[in-house]
Amino acid sequence: MQVDRRVLVRTAGHIDANTTIDINDPGPGWALLGVPVTFSGSTEFTETTQVYRNGEIQLTGASASADNDVYFVAVSGSIAFEMKLHTNDVVQVWKFTQTTASG
């Protein structure tokens, strides 16, 4: 099992609920750690990804209509939260990929 991890720390200001965040290029006001993470679609996001906000696991959804904590927006790695994010909030995105043994 391979795990790709992306960590974002909000360094300035708040982000309104349901605002799209590109986890690989979130723009100003964010500090980034880890590797880029992308999704092939909403199914891959909900089945292979765990998202944490300030250490608490968030319920992932395929779209805003799922009314979950965080939902898929685009394959580039864009997500949105159902709640406002604040300065110093830490977002962790863990994507799990099954690896096959060779030999």
Residue ranges and their predicted role:
Residues 65-67:
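Glycine-centered tight-turn motifs at strand-turn-strand junctions
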